[in-house]
């Protein structure tokens, strides 16, 4: 299958540059994947499309302020570090800009010297391994010195760090938000629970690989990035019970979908597990775990539009995106939402 089959022309003004004041006031497109029928609504009305016994699966990862701006210890030159994933207690895989001078042994100083990174190794993907030196708790130092690593297509500076977190974010480790969850408020989640819908939390730490473009024209040749996930016994049991009782399993976001499809067996039974997943879902994939998906509108030719095309059918998705553009839906991380059922 060709990458170009997932291309569409998106007017730049439809790329949402900041979140709406009220999370749940985003627009919601409802797509019936069997008939291709499209409806339009507002996210806070999502309860109209849920039923008692359904199970919403949400990703409770928390974005860390993973973008650090510092100076080279030897020359004072500006350096940007992006934390990708922790490899041990004080060591992280990082991206460095400019990368050419980030040789092993070089040190970068942040703030008033309260955080120092030493480059100790290189990675196959062109990144670096950095060892950090600091006093106190790393997360607290990072919170003071780091910035939220918003995606490259968002040009505006984020006014409030919390707007790039879901209201239920709990476990730190992501370099990007699971954006489908940004539409939920505490009040809406309570309303959903009160109607007899289960909410179950799993964890997948989103890596920046989620924004990595597909360079291969034949998509089957694309190598997917790895992300760390955790599905607890409690979560697996709740999801399996909901399915056994006839409820629909609705994944909130592509990250929850990736996780569930990784831990499900052929019958759709969810196993409690943790580990790294590099699952790449594109048309032809047979879904085992989910009956519905809540997701944002994704980039052309991205692995994410390939995943939703696998779930809803490529023709349905490309037509729905055409309708979204005609109706001026907002796209990408801070944009509007789609419910596929």
UniProtKB/Swiss-Prot annotation:
**Enzyme class of the recorded protein, top EC level:** transferase
* Annotated GO MF terms: S-adenosylmethionine:tRNA ribosyltransferase-isomerase activity
Q: Which Pfam families match?
A: Queuosine_synth
- Predominant localisation class: cytoplasm
Q: Where in the cell is it found?
A: Cytoplasm
User: What keywords tag this UniProt record?
Assistant: Cytoplasm, Queuosine biosynthesis, S-adenosyl-L-methionine, Transferase
Matches recorded under InterPro entries: QueA, QueA_dom1, QueA_dom2, QueA_sf
What Enzyme Commission number(s) appear in the record? 2.4.99.17
GO BP terms: queuosine biosynthetic process; tRNA wobble guanine modification
Glycosyltransferase in keyword set: no
Q: Any keyword Ion transport?
A: no
- Locate the coiled-coil region(s) and give their ranges: none
Pathway(s) this gene product operates in, as recorded in its UniProt entry: tRNA modification; tRNA-queuosine biosynthesis
Might you report a single GO cellular component term? Answer: cytoplasm
Q: Which reaction does it catalyse?
A: 7-aminomethyl-7-carbaguanosine(34) in tRNA + S-adenosyl-L-methionine = epoxyqueuosine(34) in tRNA + adenine + L-methionine + 2 H(+)
- What biological function has been recorded for the protein in this entry? Transfers and isomerizes the ribose moiety from AdoMet to the 7-aminomethyl group of 7-deazaguanine (preQ1-tRNA) to give epoxyqueuosine (oQ-tRNA).
> Quaternary structure per UniProt?
Monomer.
Q: Which family does it belong to?
A: Belongs to the QueA family.
Q: What is the name attached to this protein's record? A: S-adenosylmethionine:tRNA ribosyltransferase-isomerase
* Protein's organism: Caldanaerobacter subterraneus subsp. tengcongensis (strain DSM 15242 / JCM 11007 / NBRC 100824 / MB4)
Q: What lineage does the source organism belong to?
A: Bacteria, Bacillati, Bacillota, Clostridia, Thermoanaerobacterales
Gene name per UniProt: queA
């Amino acid at each position: 299958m060709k990458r170009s089959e997932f291309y569409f022309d998106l007017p730049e003004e439809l790329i949402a540059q900041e979140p709406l004041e009220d999370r749940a006031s985003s627009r919601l497109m409802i797509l019936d994947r069997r008939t291709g029928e499209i409806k339009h609504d507002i996210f806070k009305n999502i309860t109209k499309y849920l039923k008692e016994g359904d199970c919403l699966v949400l990703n409770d990862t928390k974005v860390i302020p993973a973008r650090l701006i510092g100076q080279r210890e030897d020359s004072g030159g500006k350096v940007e570090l992006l934390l990708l994933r922790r490899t041990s207690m004080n060591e992280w895989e990082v991206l460095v800009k400019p990368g050419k001078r980030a040789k092993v042994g070089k040190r970068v100083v942040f703030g008033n010297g309260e955080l120092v990174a030493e480059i100790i190794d290189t990675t196959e993907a062109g990144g670096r391994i950095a060892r950090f030196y600091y006093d106190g708790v790393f997360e607290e130092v990072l919170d003071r010195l780091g910035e939220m690593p918003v995606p490259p297509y968002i040009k505006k500076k984020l006014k409030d760090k919390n707007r790039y977190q879901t209201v239920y974010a709990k476990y730190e480790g992501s370099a990007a938000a699971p954006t489908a969850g940004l539409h939920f408020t505490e009040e809406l989640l309570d309303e959903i629970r009160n109607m007899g819908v289960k909410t179950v939390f799993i964890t997948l730490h989103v890596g920046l690989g989620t924004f990595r473009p597909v360079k291969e024209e034949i998509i089957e040749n694309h190598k997917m990035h790895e992300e760390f996930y955790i599905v607890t016994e409690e979560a697996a049991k709740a999801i399996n019970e909901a399915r056994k009782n006839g409820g629909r399993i609705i994944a909130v976001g592509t990250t929850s979908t990736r996780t569930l499809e990784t831990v499900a067996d052929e019958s759709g039974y969810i196993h409690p597990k943790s580990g790294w997943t590099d699952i790449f879902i594109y048309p032809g994939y047979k879904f085992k775990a989910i009956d519905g998906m809540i997701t944002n509108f994704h980039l052309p030719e991205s692995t994410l539009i390939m995943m939703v095309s696998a779930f809803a059918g490529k023709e349905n998705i490309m037509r729905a995106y055409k309708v979204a553009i005609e109706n001026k839906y907002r796209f990408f991380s801070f944009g509007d939402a789609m419910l596929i059922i």
